[in-house]
Amino acid sequence: METLQGLLLWMLLSVGGVWASRGPLRPLCRPINATLAAEKEACPICITFTTSICAGYCPSMVRVMPAALPAIPQPVCTYRELRFASIRLPGCPPGVDPMVSFPVALSCHCGPCQIKTTDCGVFRDQPLACAPQASSSSKDPPSQPLTSTSTPTPGASRRSSHPLPIKTS
């Protein structure tokens, strides 16, 4: 009986291990919906909006003896194709451009982190939101429709593959 239980436990653990490493617990790099925040210092209202960003698992390796060999570049989930969209911030004073542009992921891939165009930092536990304002007019800002401003750009990577606030001055 113990042999049968041991065999059953071994089968469950081996199948479970394969499922966990390739299944839904670690989704591969792909576009996902994310909520971002846009604000300008001169405009009184911060807007949150939903766009698609690149996120997910990219296979990687860490050397067992890192001092003996050079570091291996770790792939990150980043844009393969993207387009840009814009939103209008309400309440901006005259002379301040109320438009804010942001990337929309069309497709993603695992590739090297390009520090010039991508936030290569750590994953954020909490979604970013608008900074607290002293004025009560900034509470519960209205959601703004998205407007496309350009065509898809193959191979371009302009912004972070992690949710970031879009803040311009």
UniProtKB/Swiss-Prot annotation:
It is found in: Secreted. Glycans are attached at residues 33, 138, 143, 147-151, 153, 157, 160-161, 169. Belongs to the glycoprotein hormones subunit beta family. GO terms for cellular component: cytoplasm; extracellular space. Keywords: Disulfide bond, Glycoprotein, Hormone, Secreted, Signal. Residues 1-20 form the signal peptide. The keyword Cell membrane does not apply. Residues 131-169 are annotated as: Disordered. Microheterogeneity at Asn-33. O-glycosylation appears to be responsible for the beta subunit contribution to the difference in LH-receptor binding activity between LSH-B and CG-B. The gene is LHB. One of its GO terms (biological process) is G protein-coupled receptor signaling pathway. It comes from Equus caballus. The keyword Signal applies. CDD domains: GHB_like. This is Lutropin/choriogonadotropin subunit beta. One of its GO terms (molecular function) is hormone activity. Disulfide bonds join 29-77, 43-92, 46-130, 54-108, 58-110, 113-120. Promotes spermatogenesis and ovulation by stimulating the testes and ovaries to synthesize steroids. Residues 145-158 have a biased composition (Low complexity). Heterodimer of a common alpha chain and a unique beta chain which confers biological specificity to thyrotropin, lutropin, follitropin and gonadotropin.
